[in-house]
Each structure stands twice: as C-alpha cells, then as structure tokens.
A protein has these predicted regions:
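N-terminal secretory signal peptides that target proteins for export/translocation
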Residues: 1-3
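Bacterial N-terminal signal peptides
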Residues: 5-15
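Soluble, non-transmembrane alpha-helical interaction regions
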Residues: 21-349
C-alpha cells in the first residue's frame, strides 16, 4: 500500500501545476476523496443556510424596529431607540455566531479531507481544486495545501451568502451599521446609505415588514433546496468517478438521481415568484422601492447584469431575485465541487 501511495503522489506531483486528466486514475485511496467531497458539500449547504438565518435574525429585528415601532419624540427614551438598543445586543451575538459558523465550516473541511495528501485535494483527477486556482487567487488565496483550499472555500461562501441576502434584503448592510454590527473588512454586504429611517405610515411599515420576511424566506428556501439537490446529484456522479470509474450501471443510477434533483430545482424555481407575490401583494410597489422602504432600486446595477434593465414592478424584482439566486447557487457548487461541471456533462447537464 505504501508503494502504491508513493507512486500516486509522484504521479500527482508530475501533473502539477498543469491539469491532470480525470481518466488517469492516480488516487491512492478513492474512498478518501469521496469522503472529502461529501464533507465539503455537506458543510457548504449547512453553512449557507446558517449564515442566512443568522443575518435574518439580526436585520429582521432592526427592520421591524424602524418600520413598526411608533416613535415618541417627547419620551425620555424614544421607543425606536430602545428597540434598536435591544437589537444591538442581539446583533453583537449574531456576529459572534457567524464567526463561529465560519470556523466550524473550516473545521469540517479539515476533518473530512485531512486524510488525503494535499496533492490529491488539488489534482483534477481527485478532488480537483487546481481547477479553480485562479478564482481562489482572485479572492487573495493561492492554493498550496488543504488549509488554503479551506480558506478559499469558506471565504467564497461567506461572500456568496451575503450577496444572496442582500438581494433578498437590500437594506441589510445599512441595518447592520445602524446597530454597529461589523462583519469585518471583507464583508460583501453594501450599505447603500439609506439613513436608517422607516416609512411614516406604521400600517405600511407592517406591510413592508411582512413582504420583506416573505422574500427572505422564499429566497433562502430556494437556495437550500437547490444546494441540497445539486449536492445529491454531484455526490452520486463523483462516487462513480472515484469508486467505479467507467461503470455504466453506476452512471445510469446517478443519472436517475440527477434527473430527480434537477426536477426538484425546477419545481422550487416555480414556487419562488408566487411566494414573493403572496407576501408582497398588499404593498404598492412604488412604496416599496424607496430607501426608507425596501430599497429594491438599489439592486438596479446588479439586476442589469442579469438581464433585468430596471426595477419598476414587482415582476422585475422577482425575475432578478430568481436569476441571482440561480447563478450564485451554481457558483457555490463550483467552489464546493470544482469538478461539478465535468461530472454533470456526463449525464447531459
């Protein structure tokens, strides 16, 4: 076994820094690569959902403070300020919880992949992280070992989760700043400078709060189902590649798993827009888009890159939200399973 392992590493060393063909089969113990990929995929879905929930826990409360709490300028302590002070305490704990979740994701990757030699984490015929070396370099991390791979994965997931949340809740960065909740210099949440104010009409404020909550729930739900379904498909294909390479029966079985997974994703996509409609139907969209409302117009530049040139109706926003979540879901899979594109092509996806 030692001799086989040494030959495997030598083969990998000769392959770097170029890309090793997937058919060359130089993995010392394919079971370990499958375990590694499974750990990353599991951690990916869990982390994104946890971070979305934590961001929601903080910003939803702050949003409720400014939109639904009656102000009283004559009171010694304005009720809105009292509400924000309470939320500041909650949000401080949220920031700590996010940092802990990021560390837990890093630890899960390390635990799941530490049995592999670093070359097998990198090589294109194994876990495949050399395939996204440039993307990681663009994030400021050069891939040399498992620690750098974990750093790249977690960093990308941190940003991707924040971008998802910002599309659901454009004022998120502003609301975090309102209670001094600092996610650090690398945060991808943007403060669009809304001033921290809510609308004057408390009835409208409650309607906006309901709409906002519904959008966040719908967006997170779609992302969660997409990540889980894609992970099931890619895991099945990767197991065939590593444990039963060239086995047509294995691929045929994986194909069925993938067909079911993509069917689930398509079904969830169809639910997204009606869910937004249900939550936001009572809101006049013209009252939702200003900065003191839901600030949807702050997404115009990003939506334009997704083929939505303006946001003047709820339909424009829903289309942008879906396309953004679809794209980021694909991006998350690329960083969780760099070989996903190659594997999916084997079953026509």
């Amino acid at each position: 076994m030692r001799i086989a392992w040494i030959f495997a590493l030598l083969a990998g060393a000769l392959a770097l820094p170029g890309t090793t063909g997937a058919a060359e089969r130089f993995v010392a113990d394919p079971r370990l690569t499958v375990d590694c990929e499974a750990a990353i995929l599991k951690g990916s879905g869990a982390f994104v959902q946890q971070k979305l929930k934590l961001l929601d826990k903080c910003t939803a409360g702050v949003f409720k403070c400014i939109q639904t709490t009656p102000p009283d300028d004559d009171a010694e302590d304005d009720p809105v300020d009292v509400c924000l002070e309470k939320m500041a305490e909650r949000c401080a704990k949220t920031v700590e919880a996010i940092a802990a979740a990021e560390q837990a994701f890093t630890d899960a990757i390390t635990k799941g992949c530490s049995a592999l030699h670093p070359l097998e984490v990198l090589r294109a015929d194994a876990v495949g992280y050399e395939l996204i070396a440039q993307q990681c370099s663009d994030l400021g991390t050069d891939l040399t070992d498992l620690a750098s791979v974990a750093q790249c994965i977690v960093q990308e997931h941190e940003c991707a989760a924040e971008r998802l949340f910002q599309a659901e809740h454009p004022r998120a960065g502003e609301l975090l700043g309102l209670v001094d909740a600092d996610l650090g210099p690398d945060s991808c949440l943007e403060d669009f400078g809304g001033g921290g104010f809510g609308v004057d009409d408390l009835v409208l404020g409650k309607q906006l709060d309901r709409c906002d909550a519904g959008v966040r729930k719908a967006g997170a739900g779609f992302t969660g189902k997409k990540q889980k379904s894609l992970a099931q498909c890619v895991s099945a294909l990767y197991a065939c590649d590593q444990l039963a390479f060239g086995n047509a029966e294995c691929v045929a079985k994986a194909q069925k798993t993938c067909d079911k997974a993509f069917g689930t994703i398509a079904g969830e996509a169809l639910k997204l827009e009606p869910s937004v409609d249900k939550s936001c139907a009572v809101v006049d969209f013209s009252q939702a888009v200003p900065d003191e409302g839901l600030a949807f117009t702050e997404l115009v530049d990003e939506c334009d890159t997704l083929g939505v040139s303006d946001i003047v109706t709820i339909d424009h926003y829903k289309t942008c939200l879906y396309r953004q979540h679809e794209c980021i879901g694909d991006e998350l899979m690329q960083f969780a399973a760099p070989r996903a594109t190659e594997l999916l092509m084997r079953v026509g996806r």
